[in-house]
Amino acid sequence: MEPGTGGSRKRLGPRAGFRFWPPFFPRRSQAGSSKFPTPLGPENSGNPTLLSSAQPETRVSYWTKLLSQLLAPLPGLLQKVLIWSQLFGGMFPTRWLDFAGVYSALRALKGREKPAAPTAQKSLSSLQLDSSDPSVTSPLDWLEEGIHWQYSPPDLKLELKAKGSALDPAAQAFLLEQQLWGVELLPSSLQSRLYSNRELGSSPSGPLNIQRIDNFSVVSYLLNPSYLDCFPRLEVSYQNSDGNSEVVGFQTLTPESSCLREDHCHPQPLSAELIPASWQGCPPLSTEGLPEIHHLRMKRLEFLQQASKGQDLPTPDQDNGYHSLEEEHSLLRMDPKHCRDNPTQFVPAAGDIPGNTQESTEEKIELLTTEVPLALEEESPSEGCPSSEIPMEKEPGEGRISVVDYSYLEGDLPISARPACSNKLIDYILGGASSDLETSSDPEGEDWDEEAEDDGFDSDSSLSDSDLEQDPEGLHLWNSFCSVDPYNPQNFTATIQTAARIVPEEPSDSEKDLSGKSDLENSSQSGSLPETPEHSSGEEDDWESSADEAESLKLWNSFCNSDDPYNPLNFKAPFQTSGENEKGCRDSKTPSESIVAISECHTLLSCKVQLLGSQESECPDSVQRDVLSGGRHTHVKRKKVTFLEEVTEYYISGDEDRKGPWEEFARDGCRFQKRIQETEDAIGYCLTFEHRERMFNRLQGTCFKGLNVLKQC
């Protein structure tokens, strides 16, 4: 019966322990079995129950492998999330940091399997895993993929203190390469403590987490950012069967892993670089980091450094390469600070000056010679300067003159002065003076001192004879600007306040007088035109002919003296009606003077451009502007109340005078309203509801009677 009972116990063993355990929670073995087994005594070496305890764990090994394959992509995704959490530390909760670096915890644990001392029972090499047991290797392989589960701390006592000691290169197996946190993977038979000096006054760090996976304990801790200069020291001890704990090793946070700085009190820019692994067997992470973020950070630092040093930041060329002579001259001008050390400065190359096209050397020299100030005329003449140097402007407060060296040019280059114009008036406007060296020499030997007193205008503010002979087209152009428009800004002759003038009683006679005067003026104008030898061409002969002159003036007067008050050339429509105040004066002795005839509170103007040349006047050719009253037919506006000689009388005493069409319309309207009222009184009751209902019933009764008669038939 004992074998039978033993056999029945073997069959009931799996049923009694048959529970669905998740693959990441392998079923716990019986007492004495562990993934980090203690050294077995001789009394337990031949116990067959220990061998049968591993059978339930082997049945769920394939579930573990299947889930490990499904969850294989999670470590890579988790690693990326952790990298970005370093960049945006405040965006992720601190409990996410507990998942950091679990993928390398087992590798660090395997790195300790090599015996470091003869005493194997006191070292971690005595706690090697049995790789032949599939129930043990499959959860460990699954942990290598970086899957990590969070639990509340039930057993272990962790105390956080700070200790700034030297680095311990021998204890680097458990530390993961992260900047602000640490993760430790320990068997359940080991006890861990974090020690620090209380006299340093450091406060505990961030939240602590202990995760238990079967016989393993994963301890994660977060460093306090305000105490990053303090290094926690981890003491790992092993508890033997007697209950005594012996120290196995220490683990200290290194400054490389925490990325400490000397100026930790000040905010630092984000760093996207990762530090290589500090333990053997773990592949180093990418030191390249995020090149885009690093590049942007470096650019921003360079920009801030330039701004702090006061350097001019590069700005785009707003003129697209085009620049004025003043800008080019300012580029060639020397700095007063450098002038004390070096009085000369080389001309920059064509590529240094901003521009789309490179100018030739000759064009540059011409531009420079045009900028030579007149102050150099007081110094020695141009022959005193070498041919390879061009004089520039004089520095203020300096006794020497800045020059531009053109020694690289071949041959002597002529020095050209300011371009002079043949017309003295235009040359004077451009800035010409009587002390110009090159223009002072006249080939005809004329005395320039006498001509220097002439400013280009005669004493009577008219153009000189020489200017008129040299530039007849300029005179016509000037006359075109001197328009006789009364509202012309250059020659404003319009009256500010309108005033009525005396209007002739006979408009027809005034028209005749004005037309006669215009004919006389035209004839005198044609006869008084100056005849100069310069007007010998065909066009000038046509301009001088009196017939053409008279026709052109008549044509112009026909446009100006139009009867249309809304004519744009002669707008005479009144803007505001007002009473007529008859005032004025008229001088018959001066027909050439301006005469303005104002009628109906608006000005009647006619414009004539005449070129009068009288022998008596000092200036034979002058421009005179006449505003003549044209031959207009004017009339006197009547007042609102007038008295006529013939008055029509209307007597209202008779009845026939009171009868009219309005009375007929009123009578017809009254008759029509009366007829409407009579019709409504006659047939208005037919539209009431009672009458309509009565008629409906009568018609309905008639119809039924007809139906009854048809039925009887």
Curated annotation (Swiss-Prot):
Name recorded for this polypeptide: Protein phosphatase 1 regulatory subunit 15B
Biological processes per GO annotation: ER overload response; negative regulation of PERK-mediated unfolded protein response; negative regulation of protein phosphorylation; regulation of translation; response to endoplasmic reticulum stress; response to hydrogen peroxide
Function: Maintains low levels of EIF2S1 phosphorylation in unstressed cells by promoting its dephosphorylation by PP1.
Keyword tags: Diabetes mellitus, Disease variant, Dwarfism, Intellectual disability, Phosphoprotein, Translation regulation
Region (Disordered): 22-53, 115-134, 376-398, 434-472, 502-548
Phenotype upon changing P134S: Found in a patient with isolated coloboma; uncertain significance
Organism: Homo sapiens
Other comments on record: The phosphatase activity of the PPP1R15B-PP1 complex toward EIF2S1 is specifically inhibited by Salubrinal, a drug that protects cells from endoplasmic reticulum stress.
Phenotype upon changing R658C: In MSSGM2; no effect on localization; increased protein abundance; loss of interaction with protein phosphatase catalytic subunit PP1; decreased dephosphorylation of EIF2S1
Compositionally biased tracts (Acidic residues): 439-458, 539-548
Biased composition (Polar residues): 44-53
Quaternary structure note: Part of a complex containing PPP1R15B, PP1 and NCK1/2. Interacts with PP1.
UniProt KW Phosphoprotein keyword: yes
Bridged cysteine pairs (disulfide): none
UniProt xrefs under PANTHER family: GH11727P, PROTEIN PHOSPHATASE 1 REGULATORY SUBUNIT 15B
A single cellular component GO annotation: protein phosphatase type 1 complex
Low complexity biased stretches: 123-134
